A protein has these predicted regions:
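Canonical Rossmann dinucleotide-binding motif of NAD(H)/NADP(H)-dependent dehydrogenases/reductases
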Residues: 4-41
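A short, exposed helix-loop element centered on a Lys and neighboring polar residues
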Residues: 132-133, 179
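Catalytic loop of short-chain dehydrogenase/reductase
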Residues: 140-186, 197-200
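Substrate-binding pocket helix/loop in short-chain dehydrogenase/reductase
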Residues: 108-109, 116-118
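Active-site loop of short-chain dehydrogenase/reductase
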Residues: 10, 65-66, 93-94, 139-153, ...
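C-terminal helical subdomain
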Residues: 193-194, 212-277
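Conserved Rossmann-fold SDR core element
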Residues: 29, 93-95, 175-178, 184-196, ...
Length: 277
């Protein structure tokens, strides 16, 4: 794998991206020369969450990229159509789709409301299907087509079903759809998944998964961003149908010092593994 990938001139369409891992991936790709279009809901600041589409766009442009923030809900079909149309109109095509947007509720069957179940399915699984499907005609015309989904490897350990099957089903659905693209378009479109080895310091981890203590046992989103940039530099002939782990990607690329990615208070020995690993 190349340790310094060039995405120069390529156009990325991403779901989410106003904060966290998605924003970090967008900024990193912008530094590598990519155009970034992203669909997110946060138009005005929310005191509970950092970042808006506008602050994310400013960071992309500060990194040297061109940004197209699209305000909308990934669950809405019109938003998907509008996002694809505006991206193609602005940048001339779509080379890469990054399925980043995700909802999480860690509750089991009998504990989770149908409303929350539908939310996870609609954003995670359906959103991945909808955005990828809508962009597919443009990917097939690209010189470097790639679908990258932030979802885990399919772990047969039944622990994840026992603890929170609804979320597990939605994330594994994202993975299976991506592997489906890889098989259906094996020689034409690269389609891969990427997942962190450890907890990543995001608002979701702090507010839902692990609290402040978990943040002190996490890595920064930049580790996922650097790994994503490397994977996105690969062609279908080099890698497709893979479920990559961030630190494995970096190690294979010759990046051995991962301490640079430690979040405040974290050490190399107290990192907590992410879900599904």
């Amino acid at each position: 794998m190349k340790s310094q990938p060039s995405l120069s001139g390529l156009t990325i369409l991403m779901s989410g991206g106003s904060r966290g891992i998605g924003s970090a991936i967008a900024v990193r790709a912008a530094r590598a020369g990519a155009n970034i279009a992203f669909v997110a809901k946060t138009d005005v600041p929310d005191k509970r969450l950092p970042g808006t589409v506008h602050t994310a766009a400013a960071e992309i442009e500060s990194a040297g990229g061109r940004a197209l923030p699209i305000i909308g809900d990934i669950r809405d079909d019109e938003t998907i159509t509008r996002a694809v149309t505006q991206t193609v109109d602005r940048f001339g095509g779509i080379d890469i789709v990054v399925n980043n947007a995700s909802a999480i509720t860690l509750s089991g069957i009998g504990e989770l409301s149908l409303k929350r179940y539908d939310l996870m399915q609609d954003i995670n699984t359906r959103g991945t299907f909808a955005l990828t499907s809508a962009a597919l005609p443009h990917l097939l015309e690209s010189r470097h087509p790639h679908v990258l989904t932030l979802s885990p490897p399919l772990n047969p350990d039944r622990r994840w079903l026992a603890e929170y099957a609804p979320y597990t089903v939605s994330k594994y659905g994202m993975t299976m759809l991506t592997l489906g693209v890889a098989e259906q378009y094996r020689e034409r479109i690269a389609a891969n998944c990427l997942w962190p080895r450890t907890l990543i310091a995001t608002a979701a981890v702090q507010n839902i998964v692990a609290g402040a203590e978990g943040m002190r046992a996490a890595r920064r989103p930049e580790i996922m961003a650097d790994a994503a940039a490397i994977v996105l530099g690969l062609t279908a002939a080099q890698a497709t149908g893979r479920c990559f782990i961030d630190e494995d990607v970096l190690t294979e690329a010759g990046i051995s010092n991962l301490d640079r990615y430690l979040h405040d208070g974290a050490t190399a020995t107290n990192l907590v593994p992410d879900l599904f690993l």
